[in-house]
């Protein structure tokens, strides 16, 4: 398995920022009761529950922010990897800033649903693959959806070279529900708190292996990351180019306006 694949179950998927959205953003994300339900459903697996508030170093902050990792939750992960790897992944996207179709460099993407759709990048439409074409993954998706009693969408990221590719620091503005399923090579996953555009507290780092599932509570998704005055979480993954935090004296804070000019590398 040469590449790293992450398939994200969520209420709203997209092939790239600014491209067509599939589904609608939920009003609420995953709370502790839902996290507990998943823990109980996978009680025969190794469970890691990370309270990310401990990395803020602020004892007065008490908003629920838990990352759940279920190790080797998907036992037939190699079969699913082979099912996914040879699909035609999107390597192009429509850039809103430059108003034209560009090549994807940091990763490739693909959305999944109950139908097939050919890409039309000029009109901001990415490729969609029908679940019937990936029956082994579909079984795992349905298992999770049945546990939660939800009909979730699916969005995939493909990293062909984890030493050169990744995704920069960001929050998931388009959704409140995130369940990541990893296939292929292990890859890093980082979280850090921010306030007023500045990183604060301690960075949390882990590796997500093939067959692992990770689940973000609502706060952990970073859906509120554009609200500068709040304590918010951002995450990143991949090589150092995308995961390094440049914290230097007198350096201009990493604000949303700065990030928007580099959206090509972030998303």
Give the label of every model feature segment:
Residues 1-267:
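Non-heme Fe(II) oxygenase metal-center motifs and adjacent flexible, charged/small-residue loops
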């Amino acid at each position: 398995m040469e590449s790293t694949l992450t398939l994200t179950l969520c209420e709203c998927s997209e092939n790239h920022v600014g491209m067509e959205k599939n589904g609608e953003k939920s009003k609420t994300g995953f709370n502790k009761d839902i996290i507990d339900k998943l823990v109980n459903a996978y009680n025969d697996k190794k469970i890691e529950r990370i309270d990310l508030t401990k990395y803020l170093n602020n004892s007065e902050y008490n908003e629920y922010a838990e990352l759940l990792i279920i190790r080797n939750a998907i036992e037939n992960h190699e079969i699913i990897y082979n099912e996914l790897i040879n699909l035609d992944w999107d390597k192009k996207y429509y850039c809103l800033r430059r108003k034209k179709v560009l090549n994807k460099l940091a990763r490739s993407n693909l959305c999944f649903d109950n139908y097939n759709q050919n890409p039309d990048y000029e009109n901001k439409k990415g490729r969609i693959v029908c679940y019937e074409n990936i029956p082994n993954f579909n079984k795992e998706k349905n298992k999770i959806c049945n546990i939660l009693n939800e009909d979730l969408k699916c969005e995939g990221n493909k990293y062909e070279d984890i030493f050169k590719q990744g995704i920069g620091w960001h929050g998931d503005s388009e959704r409140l529900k995130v369940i990541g399923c990893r296939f292929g090579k292990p890859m890093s996953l980082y979280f850090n708190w921010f306030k007023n555009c500045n990183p604060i507290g301690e960075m949390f780092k882990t590796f997500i292996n093939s067959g692992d599932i990770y689940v973000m509570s609502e706060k952990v998704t970073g859906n509120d990351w554009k609200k500068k005055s709040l304590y918010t979480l951002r995450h990143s993954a991949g090589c150092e180019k995308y995961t390094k935090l440049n914290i230097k004296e007198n350096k201009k804070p990493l604000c949303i306006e700065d990030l928007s000019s580099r959206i090509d590398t972030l998303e």
